[in-house]
Every structure is written in structure tokens, then in C-alpha cells.
């Protein structure tokens, strides 16, 4: 059974926008944006796409304005929206690692622990989560909402500390700040409206989106290797391959050769290929993967 009316997909606008559109493209959904238009085209008749602020997507999905979308776990906690969390998708603006909301102070300040900030001003965009963090720790602070340029608040003397999101810590350090605590570890999540999730046809579509997004992310860390191996070297080549991976081994028309194919972690290829060559493999081909399901 097909979906009668297209489902509304929320795509985060801003820092996650390009990474999300690229991930969707690798998953099979091409997004075509129009200048100053929040309704990009998508190559799926069962979906319509909308660009929304990442902070607003949880509320829109709870209210049924959107059926499914991608947002941050941080903003889901901040809004407290009642939605279905379909899956964690660990990617961010520049990496496939979680981001961190950290508590940071001026590099030359005397503060070394959250407790040192009792009675002080803390600026952040993540107001509710930050208030709960200090309340749970029993520390009374004045948490103030920051409308942007949060890193500059301490430098300008507008706050004693900030809670800000970072992937690498580079921007924090560039502003002369020092991290004294981690408030929250966050990543992208795929979320769905509860009514949409309970509808069998719409749920099937949401699960399709999840399956292919997960497959594209998994493929990011893997590569495929193909090679030809003479029979006399087969055992030596197989001994070099990671023990957790089971290669495909097929005989060639010339029965003194085998074709070997395997998927391995991208991080080991640099060292693995020379070892395979030394063990007797020839015609080694490395190729990228779009999805691994």
C-alpha cells in the first residue's frame, strides 16, 4: 500500500544543512534547493522536504506540521518534545563523531570546576539543559540566554562562563577560552511524529529512510578491496586480512588464480595494501562504498 499524501520531511537549516543534504544524497534522495526558498525539491513522490531551524524541528514534528525529520539530541532534550526517536545518526558539520556542549571559561580565569561558578553568570543558547545541569549538581548560577556569538560573551565581560557546542574545541580555544566540564554529548537523531509512526504505510517509509541513512553512514568508514591472487599465495594473502571480515574468494578461468574481495575499515587500508602486495596479491583495487546495509 502506498502513501496517499506525501510525508513532510524536516531538514535542518544551518550548520547541519550541507552534511544532511549530502547524507540524503548518498542514501538515494537528491535535494535541490532554490534561492531563498525553504521548500527544496526531492526526488521522491512520497516525500516533500522543508528546511527548518534545527531547534524548531522537534516541535514541528510533535505538532504534526512535519512527519519525520533530523534534529539534534540536544534540541530534543531542550524542547522536551513528545516524538518517536527512530534512531541515532552520528554525524555533524565536519565529522562523523558526536558533538559536545561544554562549560568554558576565560583561559586566565581562576575557575577550574563547575562549583567555582556559584553565583556567576553563564551564557548559552541551550538554556533549559544548562539550568538542569547546574540544578542537578546543586550549583546556583545565573543562566542567561545568548542570541549568538556566545564565545565572545566571556571575552566582552558579559558572562563569567558559557555553555557552547563544539566538535573539535578549536573555536573555543581560538577565543581564549578553556573547557572545564562537559555538559552534554549530542548527535543527530531521526525523529517521527507519533501519529505518522502508528500509521503502517508512513512507518514503513520512515523505516526505509532510517535504513538507508544508517547504511550510508556505515559506508563512510568502510572501503572495498578487490585483488587477484595466485593459488600459491592465497593462504598468505588471507592471513593478512582482518580476522573479523570474511572475504569472498572465487576461482578465475585460469585455475591458478583466485579473485578475492573484502570490505574493511578505511583506517587500516593504508597499511593493509602494501602487506597484501608483499604477500602476492596483484591488481589491487580500492573502491568507495555508497551504502552498507
UniProtKB/Swiss-Prot annotation:
InterPro entries: ATP-PRT_HisG_long, ATP_PRibTrfase_cat, ATP_PRibTrfase_CS, ATP_PRibTrfase_HisG, HisG_C, N-reg_PII-like_a/b, N-reg_PII/ATP_PRibTrfase_C. Pfam families: HisG (PF01634), HisG_C (PF08029). Pathway: Amino-acid biosynthesis; L-histidine biosynthesis; L-histidine from 5-phospho-alpha-D-ribose 1-diphosphate: step 1/9. Feedback inhibited by histidine. Its EC number is 2.4.2.17. It is found in: Cytoplasm. GO terms for biological process: L-histidine biosynthetic process. SUPFAM superfamilies: GlnB-like (SSF54913), Periplasmic binding protein-like II (SSF53850). It comes from the Bacteria. Its cofactor is Mg(2+). It catalyses: 1-(5-phospho-beta-D-ribosyl)-ATP + diphosphate = 5-phospho-alpha-D-ribose 1-diphosphate + ATP. One of its GO terms (molecular function) is ATP phosphoribosyltransferase activity. Belongs to the ATP phosphoribosyltransferase family. Long subfamily. Catalyzes the condensation of ATP and 5-phosphoribose 1-diphosphate to form N'-(5'-phosphoribosyl)-ATP (PR-ATP). Has a crucial role in the pathway because the rate of histidine biosynthesis seems to be controlled primarily by regulation of HisG enzymatic activity. This is ATP phosphoribosyltransferase.
Amino acid at each position: 500500500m502506498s502513501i496517499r499524501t506525501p510525508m513532510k520531511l524536516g531538514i535542518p537549516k544551518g550548520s547541519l544543512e550541507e552534511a544532511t543534504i549530502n547524507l540524503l544524497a548518498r542514501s538515494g534522495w537528491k535535494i535541490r534547493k532554490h534561492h531563498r526558498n525553504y521548500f527544496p525539491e526531492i526526488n521522491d513522490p512520497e516525500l516533500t522536504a522543508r528546511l527548518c531551524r534545527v531547534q524548531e524541528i522537534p516541535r514541528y514534528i510533535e505538532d504534526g506540521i512535519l512527519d519525520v525529520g533530523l534534529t539534534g539530541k540536544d534540541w530534543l532534550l531542550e524542547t522536551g518534545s513528545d516524538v518517536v526517536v527512530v534512531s541515532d545518526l552520528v554525524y555533524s558539520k565536519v565529522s562523523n563523531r558526536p558533538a559536545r556542549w561544554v562549560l568554558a571559561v576565560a583561559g586566565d580565569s581562576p575557575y577550574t570546576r563547575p562549583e567555582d561558578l556559584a553565583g556567576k553568570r553563564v551564557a548559552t543558547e541551550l538554556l533549559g539543559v544548562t539550568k538542569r545541569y547546574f540544578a542537578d549538581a546543586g550549583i546556583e548560577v545565573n543562566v542567561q540566554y545568548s542570541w549568538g556569538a556566545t564565545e565572545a560573551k566571556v571575552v566582552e565581560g558579559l558572562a563569567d562562563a558559557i555553555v557552547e557546542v563544539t566538535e573539535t574545541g578549536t573555536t573555543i580555544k581560538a577565543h581564549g577560552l578553556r573547557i572545564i566540564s562537559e555538559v552534554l554529548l549530542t548527535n543527530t537523531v531521526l525523529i517521527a511524529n507519533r501519529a505518522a509512526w502508528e500509521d503502517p504505510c508512513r512507518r514503513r517509509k520512515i523505516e526505509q529512510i532510517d535504513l538507508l541513512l544508517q547504511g550510508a553512514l556505515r559506508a563512510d568508514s568502510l572501503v572495498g578491496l578487490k585483488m587477484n591472487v595466485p593459488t600459491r599465495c592465497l593462504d598468505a594473502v588471507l592471513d593478512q586480512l582482518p580476522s573479523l571480515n570474511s572475504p569472498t574468494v572465487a576461482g578465475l578461468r585460469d585455475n591458478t588464480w583466485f579473485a578475492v574481495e573484502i570490505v574493511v575499515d578505511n583506517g587500516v587500508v593504508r597499511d593493509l595494501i602494501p602487506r597484501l602486495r608483499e604477500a602476492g596479491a596483484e591488481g589491487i583495487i580500492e573502491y568507495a562504498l555508497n551504502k552498507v546495509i
